[in-house]
């Protein structure tokens, strides 16, 4: 426990906060190149095959990004746009890929939540 005099002379050192957005450099989106596309099983008690991709961002950071929605046309060397947002049951996956931008196509025939999946507006009858 420091004395008052020691605190006046030196003060207290502030704790360094860990940066949650280290890979994105404080940017809302970042462009990257797909290195590998694979599936991963989630933590307990969930069960699925989550589609993920290893992406090298334009600032040379390698990250894992989740591919949302049903089905995708993603493969190695495709150019993608990545946003933040973790997948709670997949450790190490802290970002999402944006559908309907660059090489990752939107979901065809999707009617609800279209903006999240890059889907076109359906033709009215």
From Swiss-Prot:
SUPFAM superfamilies to which the protein is assigned, alphabetical: Nucleic acid-binding proteins (SSF50249)
Role summary: Protein S12 is involved in the translation initiation step.
One BP term from GO: translation
Gene3D superfamilies, per database record: Nucleic acid-binding proteins
Compartment annotation: Mitochondrion
Family from the record: Belongs to the universal ribosomal protein uS12 family.
Keywords assigned by UniProt, alphabetized: Mitochondrion, Ribonucleoprotein, Ribosomal protein
InterPro entries: NA-bd_OB-fold, Ribosomal_uS12, Ribosomal_uS12_bac
Name of the protein described by the UniProt record: Small ribosomal subunit protein uS12m
Biased composition (Basic and acidic residues): 10-23
Region (Disordered): 1-29, 105-125
Gene Ontology cellular-component annotations: mitochondrion; ribosome; small ribosomal subunit
Sample GO molecular function, one term: structural constituent of ribosome
Main subcellular location of this protein, as a coarse class: mitochondrion
Pfam short name (any one): Ribosom_S12_S23
């Amino acid at each position: 426990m420091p004395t008052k005099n020691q605190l006046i002379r030196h003060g207290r050192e502030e704790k360094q906060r860990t940066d949650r957005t280290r890979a994105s450099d404080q940017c809302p989106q970042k462009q990257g190149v797909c290195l590998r596309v694979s599936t991963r099983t989630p933590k307990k008690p969930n069960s699925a095959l989550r589609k993920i991709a290893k992406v090298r961002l334009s600032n040379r950071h390698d990250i894992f990004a989740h591919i949302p929605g049903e089905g995708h046309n993603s493969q190695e060397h495709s150019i993608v746009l990545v946003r933040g947002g973790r997948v709670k049951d997949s450790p190490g996956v802290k970002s999402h890929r944006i559908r309907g931008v660059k090489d990752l196509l939107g979901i065809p025939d999707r009617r609800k939540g279209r903006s999240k999946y890059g889907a076109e507006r359906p033709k009215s009858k």
